[in-house]
Amino acid sequence: MRILQVIPVLDMAGAETMCQNLSVELHKMGHDVLVISLYTKETPLTENLRKNGVPVVFLEKKTGLDILCFYRLYREIQKFQPDVVHSHIYAGKYAHIAASAAGVKVKIYTVHNIAQKEATSSDQKINRFLFRRMGVVPVALSEEVRQTIVDVYHLDSKEIPIACNGIPMERCEPCSAYSKTATNYIHVGRFCEVKNHANLIHGFVKAHEQYPAIQLRLYGDGPLRQKMENLVAELQAQDFIHFMGLTDDVYSAMAKADVFILPSIYEGMPMTLIEAMATGLPIITTPVGGIVDMLEDGKEAAFTGTDPDSIAGSVSMLVDNAALRQSLGQTARIKAKQFSAETMAKKYLEIYSEGI
Protein backbone atom coordinates (compact mmCIF):
# COMPACT_ATOMS: atom_id res chain seq x y z
CA MET A 1 0.00 0.00 0.00
CA ARG A 2 1.19 3.54 -0.77
CA ILE A 3 0.45 5.84 2.15
CA LEU A 4 0.91 9.61 2.31
CA GLN A 5 1.01 11.30 5.71
CA VAL A 6 0.46 15.08 5.74
CA ILE A 7 1.20 17.22 8.79
CA PRO A 8 1.79 20.97 9.28
CA VAL A 9 5.27 20.63 10.80
CA LEU A 10 7.29 17.92 12.54
CA ASP A 11 7.99 19.65 15.84
CA MET A 12 8.73 17.65 18.98
CA ALA A 13 5.11 17.30 20.10
CA GLY A 14 2.45 14.62 20.50
CA ALA A 15 0.66 14.51 17.14
CA GLU A 16 3.95 14.86 15.32
CA THR A 17 5.55 12.03 17.30
CA MET A 18 2.52 9.84 16.60
CA CYS A 19 2.85 10.59 12.87
CA GLN A 20 6.52 9.60 13.00
CA ASN A 21 5.83 6.39 14.94
CA LEU A 22 3.03 5.37 12.59
CA SER A 23 5.03 6.13 9.45
CA VAL A 24 8.10 4.19 10.61
CA GLU A 25 6.00 1.20 11.67
CA LEU A 26 4.07 1.12 8.39
CA HIS A 27 7.38 1.24 6.51
CA LYS A 28 8.69 -1.68 8.61
CA MET A 29 5.60 -3.63 7.57
CA GLY A 30 6.55 -3.22 3.92
CA HIS A 31 4.36 -0.30 2.86
CA ASP A 32 5.55 2.70 0.83
CA VAL A 33 5.24 5.74 3.08
CA LEU A 34 5.90 9.40 2.33
CA VAL A 35 5.58 12.18 4.92
CA ILE A 36 4.81 15.71 3.74
CA SER A 37 5.35 18.65 6.09
CA LEU A 38 3.59 21.85 5.02
CA TYR A 39 6.22 24.02 6.68
CA THR A 40 9.95 23.64 6.20
CA LYS A 41 11.67 22.76 9.46
CA GLU A 42 14.32 20.15 10.16
CA THR A 43 13.84 18.49 13.56
CA PRO A 44 14.89 15.27 15.31
CA LEU A 45 11.65 13.75 13.97
CA THR A 46 12.51 14.48 10.32
CA GLU A 47 15.98 13.09 10.93
CA ASN A 48 14.59 9.93 12.51
CA LEU A 49 12.09 9.40 9.70
CA ARG A 50 14.82 9.50 7.05
CA LYS A 51 17.09 7.34 9.19
CA ASN A 52 14.34 4.70 9.21
CA GLY A 53 13.80 4.85 5.45
CA VAL A 54 10.79 7.20 5.33
CA PRO A 55 11.31 10.20 3.01
CA VAL A 56 10.15 13.66 4.07
CA VAL A 57 9.09 16.43 1.68
CA PHE A 58 8.73 20.09 2.70
CA LEU A 59 6.17 22.27 0.89
CA GLU A 60 7.61 25.60 2.09
CA LYS A 61 4.19 26.86 3.14
CA LYS A 62 3.85 30.54 4.03
CA THR A 63 2.02 31.76 7.13
CA GLY A 64 -1.74 32.03 6.70
CA LEU A 65 -3.72 30.72 3.75
CA ASP A 66 -1.25 29.70 1.04
CA ILE A 67 -2.96 28.88 -2.25
CA LEU A 68 0.32 27.75 -3.81
CA CYS A 69 0.58 25.13 -1.07
CA PHE A 70 -2.52 23.39 -2.50
CA TYR A 71 -0.84 23.23 -5.90
CA ARG A 72 2.47 21.94 -4.52
CA LEU A 73 0.66 19.30 -2.51
CA TYR A 74 -1.45 18.31 -5.53
CA ARG A 75 1.75 17.83 -7.57
CA GLU A 76 3.33 15.69 -4.84
CA ILE A 77 0.19 13.55 -4.65
CA GLN A 78 0.20 13.04 -8.40
CA LYS A 79 3.88 12.13 -8.27
CA PHE A 80 3.56 9.67 -5.36
CA GLN A 81 0.18 8.20 -6.42
CA PRO A 82 -0.92 7.18 -2.91
CA ASP A 83 -3.69 4.75 -2.09
CA VAL A 84 -4.32 6.70 1.12
CA VAL A 85 -3.89 10.32 2.19
CA HIS A 86 -3.80 10.61 5.98
CA SER A 87 -3.74 14.09 7.53
CA HIS A 88 -3.01 15.39 11.01
CA ILE A 89 -4.04 18.57 12.85
CA TYR A 90 -4.90 21.49 10.54
CA ALA A 91 -3.19 19.95 7.48
CA GLY A 92 -6.53 18.37 6.62
CA LYS A 93 -7.91 21.34 4.70
CA TYR A 94 -4.87 21.28 2.40
CA ALA A 95 -4.41 17.51 2.22
CA HIS A 96 -7.93 16.40 1.41
CA ILE A 97 -8.89 19.09 -1.07
CA ALA A 98 -5.68 18.32 -2.98
CA ALA A 99 -6.26 14.57 -2.58
CA SER A 100 -9.81 14.82 -3.92
CA ALA A 101 -8.61 16.84 -6.90
CA ALA A 102 -6.02 14.12 -7.57
CA GLY A 103 -8.64 11.38 -7.38
CA VAL A 104 -7.49 9.72 -4.15
CA LYS A 105 -10.34 7.66 -2.74
CA VAL A 106 -9.21 6.97 0.83
CA LYS A 107 -8.84 10.12 2.92
CA ILE A 108 -8.22 9.87 6.67
CA TYR A 109 -8.00 12.61 9.30
CA THR A 110 -6.86 11.82 12.85
CA VAL A 111 -8.49 14.06 15.46
CA HIS A 112 -5.64 14.42 17.95
CA ASN A 113 -7.53 16.10 20.78
CA ILE A 114 -11.05 16.63 22.02
CA ALA A 115 -12.87 18.05 19.00
CA GLN A 116 -13.94 21.26 20.72
CA LYS A 117 -10.29 22.24 21.18
CA GLU A 118 -8.59 20.48 18.26
CA ALA A 119 -9.64 23.01 15.59
CA THR A 120 -10.66 26.66 15.43
CA SER A 121 -14.31 27.48 14.70
CA SER A 122 -13.46 28.26 11.07
CA ASP A 123 -11.50 25.02 10.70
CA GLN A 124 -14.40 23.12 12.28
CA LYS A 125 -16.61 24.38 9.45
CA ILE A 126 -14.06 23.17 6.91
CA ASN A 127 -13.76 19.82 8.69
CA ARG A 128 -17.54 19.44 8.70
CA PHE A 129 -17.48 19.89 4.92
CA LEU A 130 -14.61 17.40 4.56
CA PHE A 131 -16.38 14.77 6.66
CA ARG A 132 -19.85 15.19 5.18
CA ARG A 133 -19.17 16.07 1.54
CA MET A 134 -15.70 14.83 0.62
CA GLY A 135 -15.67 11.39 2.19
CA VAL A 136 -12.92 12.14 4.70
CA VAL A 137 -12.99 9.67 7.61
CA PRO A 138 -12.27 11.16 11.05
CA VAL A 139 -10.39 8.84 13.40
CA ALA A 140 -10.65 9.22 17.17
CA LEU A 141 -7.92 8.34 19.65
CA SER A 142 -10.38 7.00 22.23
CA GLU A 143 -14.08 6.57 23.02
CA GLU A 144 -14.09 9.88 24.90
CA VAL A 145 -12.57 11.70 21.91
CA ARG A 146 -15.02 9.98 19.55
CA GLN A 147 -17.95 11.36 21.55
CA THR A 148 -16.57 14.89 21.21
CA ILE A 149 -16.39 14.41 17.41
CA VAL A 150 -20.04 13.32 17.45
CA ASP A 151 -20.96 16.40 19.51
CA VAL A 152 -19.07 18.91 17.35
CA TYR A 153 -19.62 17.49 13.86
CA HIS A 154 -22.98 15.73 14.40
CA LEU A 155 -21.77 12.47 12.89
CA ASP A 156 -22.91 8.96 13.72
CA SER A 157 -20.39 7.33 16.07
CA LYS A 158 -20.35 4.31 13.72
CA GLU A 159 -18.71 6.55 11.10
CA ILE A 160 -15.80 7.31 13.45
CA PRO A 161 -13.27 4.49 13.96
CA ILE A 162 -10.98 4.48 16.99
CA ALA A 163 -7.21 3.99 16.72
CA CYS A 164 -5.16 4.50 19.87
CA ASN A 165 -1.78 6.19 19.71
CA GLY A 166 1.25 3.94 19.96
CA ILE A 167 4.96 4.02 20.68
CA PRO A 168 7.91 1.73 19.83
CA MET A 169 7.96 -0.40 22.97
CA GLU A 170 11.44 -1.70 22.23
CA ARG A 171 12.88 1.76 22.94
CA CYS A 172 11.52 1.93 26.49
CA GLU A 173 13.74 1.42 29.51
CA PRO A 174 11.44 -0.12 32.15
CA CYS A 175 11.99 0.69 35.82
CA SER A 176 13.97 -2.06 37.49
CA ALA A 177 13.50 -0.75 41.04
CA TYR A 178 11.40 1.78 42.92
CA SER A 179 13.25 3.94 45.43
CA LYS A 180 12.07 4.16 49.02
CA THR A 181 11.49 7.89 48.63
CA ALA A 182 10.40 9.64 45.43
CA THR A 183 12.49 12.74 44.86
CA ASN A 184 12.65 13.10 41.07
CA TYR A 185 9.42 14.21 39.37
CA ILE A 186 9.27 14.73 35.61
CA HIS A 187 6.90 16.51 33.23
CA VAL A 188 7.21 16.32 29.45
CA GLY A 189 5.11 18.65 27.34
CA ARG A 190 4.88 21.80 25.29
CA PHE A 191 4.79 25.04 27.24
CA CYS A 192 1.23 26.15 26.41
CA GLU A 193 -1.94 26.84 28.41
CA VAL A 194 -3.40 23.36 28.08
CA LYS A 195 -0.45 21.76 29.89
CA ASN A 196 -1.20 23.80 33.04
CA HIS A 197 2.43 24.54 33.91
CA ALA A 198 1.60 27.50 36.18
CA ASN A 199 -0.57 25.45 38.53
CA LEU A 200 1.92 22.58 38.38
CA ILE A 201 4.69 24.94 39.49
CA HIS A 202 2.61 26.49 42.29
CA GLY A 203 1.50 23.05 43.46
CA PHE A 204 5.03 21.66 43.43
CA VAL A 205 6.34 24.64 45.41
CA LYS A 206 3.64 23.95 48.01
CA ALA A 207 4.61 20.25 48.20
CA HIS A 208 8.29 21.21 48.43
CA GLU A 209 7.59 23.07 51.68
CA GLN A 210 6.72 19.72 53.26
CA TYR A 211 9.25 17.61 51.31
CA PRO A 212 12.34 19.78 50.62
CA ALA A 213 14.24 16.97 48.84
CA ILE A 214 11.87 16.72 45.87
CA GLN A 215 12.89 18.04 42.44
CA LEU A 216 10.84 18.75 39.30
CA ARG A 217 12.31 18.57 35.80
CA LEU A 218 10.31 20.17 32.99
CA TYR A 219 11.12 18.92 29.49
CA GLY A 220 9.88 20.75 26.42
CA ASP A 221 9.66 24.16 24.83
CA GLY A 222 6.92 26.48 23.67
CA PRO A 223 5.45 29.98 23.82
CA LEU A 224 4.99 30.04 27.61
CA ARG A 225 8.41 28.75 28.59
CA GLN A 226 9.90 32.16 29.39
CA LYS A 227 6.82 33.11 31.39
CA MET A 228 7.15 29.90 33.42
CA GLU A 229 10.86 30.50 33.99
CA ASN A 230 9.97 33.96 35.30
CA LEU A 231 7.36 32.43 37.60
CA VAL A 232 9.87 29.95 39.03
CA ALA A 233 12.29 32.83 39.64
CA GLU A 234 9.58 34.87 41.38
CA LEU A 235 8.81 31.91 43.64
CA GLN A 236 12.55 31.41 44.28
CA ALA A 237 12.22 27.80 43.19
CA GLN A 238 15.16 27.61 40.77
CA ASP A 239 17.01 25.18 43.04
CA PHE A 240 14.34 22.48 42.72
CA ILE A 241 12.39 23.24 39.52
CA HIS A 242 14.55 22.81 36.42
CA PHE A 243 13.90 23.64 32.76
CA MET A 244 15.54 20.92 30.69
CA GLY A 245 14.55 22.01 27.16
CA LEU A 246 13.76 19.62 24.33
CA THR A 247 15.01 16.05 24.29
CA ASP A 248 15.04 13.48 21.51
CA ASP A 249 15.52 10.70 24.06
CA VAL A 250 12.57 11.00 26.41
CA TYR A 251 12.92 7.36 27.44
CA SER A 252 16.32 7.94 29.06
CA ALA A 253 14.97 11.01 30.85
CA MET A 254 12.05 9.01 32.22
CA ALA A 255 14.31 6.14 33.28
CA LYS A 256 16.01 8.55 35.72
CA ALA A 257 12.74 9.78 37.26
CA ASP A 258 10.62 8.49 40.14
CA VAL A 259 7.23 9.94 39.16
CA PHE A 260 5.67 11.32 35.96
CA ILE A 261 3.18 14.17 36.32
CA LEU A 262 0.81 15.57 33.68
CA PRO A 263 -1.93 17.82 35.15
CA SER A 264 -3.34 19.03 31.81
CA ILE A 265 -6.56 21.00 31.43
CA TYR A 266 -7.60 18.84 28.48
CA GLU A 267 -5.95 16.16 26.32
CA GLY A 268 -6.55 13.69 23.52
CA MET A 269 -4.26 10.70 24.08
CA PRO A 270 -0.89 12.13 25.16
CA MET A 271 2.13 10.34 23.73
CA THR A 272 4.20 11.25 26.78
CA LEU A 273 1.69 9.48 29.01
CA ILE A 274 2.06 6.28 26.98
CA GLU A 275 5.85 6.63 27.20
CA ALA A 276 5.64 6.99 30.99
CA MET A 277 3.32 3.97 31.21
CA ALA A 278 5.69 1.84 29.14
CA THR A 279 8.61 2.89 31.34
CA GLY A 280 6.71 1.76 34.42
CA LEU A 281 6.69 5.18 36.05
CA PRO A 282 3.98 5.91 38.60
CA ILE A 283 1.77 8.59 37.05
CA ILE A 284 -0.07 11.62 38.41
CA THR A 285 -2.50 13.01 35.84
CA THR A 286 -5.89 14.63 35.36
CA PRO A 287 -8.96 12.63 34.26
CA VAL A 288 -9.57 14.62 31.07
CA GLY A 289 -10.19 13.70 27.41
CA GLY A 290 -8.82 10.34 26.32
CA ILE A 291 -6.87 9.85 29.55
CA VAL A 292 -9.95 8.37 31.22
CA ASP A 293 -9.97 5.67 28.53
CA MET A 294 -6.29 4.90 29.14
CA LEU A 295 -5.92 4.74 32.91
CA GLU A 296 -7.95 3.84 35.98
CA ASP A 297 -7.58 5.98 39.08
CA GLY A 298 -5.87 4.18 41.95
CA LYS A 299 -4.95 1.24 39.76
CA GLU A 300 -2.76 2.56 36.91
CA ALA A 301 -2.48 6.23 37.92
CA ALA A 302 -3.24 8.73 40.64
CA PHE A 303 -5.79 11.20 39.31
CA THR A 304 -5.50 14.79 40.47
CA GLY A 305 -7.27 18.09 39.94
CA THR A 306 -5.90 20.97 37.89
CA ASP A 307 -5.54 23.37 40.85
CA PRO A 308 -2.32 23.84 42.87
CA ASP A 309 -3.71 22.34 46.09
CA SER A 310 -4.79 19.12 44.37
CA ILE A 311 -1.46 18.84 42.58
CA ALA A 312 0.46 19.45 45.82
CA GLY A 313 -1.57 16.75 47.56
CA SER A 314 -0.93 14.20 44.81
CA VAL A 315 2.80 14.95 44.71
CA SER A 316 3.06 14.63 48.50
CA MET A 317 1.02 11.41 48.57
CA LEU A 318 3.61 9.53 46.48
CA VAL A 319 6.82 10.78 48.11
CA ASP A 320 7.04 8.16 50.87
CA ASN A 321 4.63 5.55 49.52
CA ALA A 322 6.95 3.23 47.60
CA ALA A 323 4.41 0.39 47.59
CA LEU A 324 1.77 2.53 45.88
CA ARG A 325 4.30 3.89 43.38
CA GLN A 326 5.43 0.38 42.48
CA SER A 327 1.84 -0.85 42.13
CA LEU A 328 0.80 2.08 39.92
CA GLY A 329 3.92 1.85 37.78
CA GLN A 330 3.88 -1.90 37.20
CA THR A 331 0.15 -1.98 36.44
CA ALA A 332 0.49 0.92 34.01
CA ARG A 333 3.35 -0.86 32.26
CA ILE A 334 1.15 -3.91 31.66
CA LYS A 335 -1.59 -1.64 30.28
CA ALA A 336 0.93 0.11 28.01
CA LYS A 337 1.23 -3.00 25.85
CA GLN A 338 -2.12 -2.01 24.32
CA PHE A 339 -0.48 1.15 22.99
CA SER A 340 2.37 -0.19 20.87
CA ALA A 341 3.27 1.31 17.50
CA GLU A 342 2.65 -2.09 15.92
CA THR A 343 -0.90 -2.26 17.30
CA MET A 344 -1.55 1.30 16.13
CA ALA A 345 -0.25 0.60 12.61
CA LYS A 346 -2.34 -2.58 12.27
CA LYS A 347 -5.47 -0.67 13.28
CA TYR A 348 -4.81 2.08 10.75
CA LEU A 349 -4.21 -0.51 8.04
CA GLU A 350 -7.66 -1.92 8.81
CA ILE A 351 -9.15 1.57 8.47
CA TYR A 352 -7.27 2.24 5.23
CA SER A 353 -8.30 -1.12 3.77
CA GLU A 354 -11.99 -0.55 4.48
CA GLY A 355 -11.95 2.38 2.06
CA ILE A 356 -10.01 0.75 -0.77
What is each stretch, according to the model?
Residues 4, 178-195, 201-204:
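Conserved donor-binding/catalytic core segment of Leloir-type glycosyltransferases
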Residues 64-68, 147-152, 157-182, 192:
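Acidic anion/phosphate-binding donor-loop and adjacent secondary structure
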Residues 87-94, 111:
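Short His-centered aromatic/hydrophobic patch
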Residues 229-245:
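Nucleotide-activated donor-binding/catalytic signature segment of Leloir-type glycosyltransferases, i.e.
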Residues 246, 265:
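Aromatic "clamp/platform" in nucleotide-sugar-dependent glycosyltransferases that forms part
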Residues 282-285, 295:
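Short hydrophobic beta-strand element within catalytic cores of glycosyltransferases
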Residues 297-309, 317-322:
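Conserved acidic donor-binding segment of nucleotide-sugar-dependent glycosyltransferases
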Residues 310, 317, 324-338, 347-350:
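A short, well-ordered alpha-helix in the C-terminal region of glycosyltransferases
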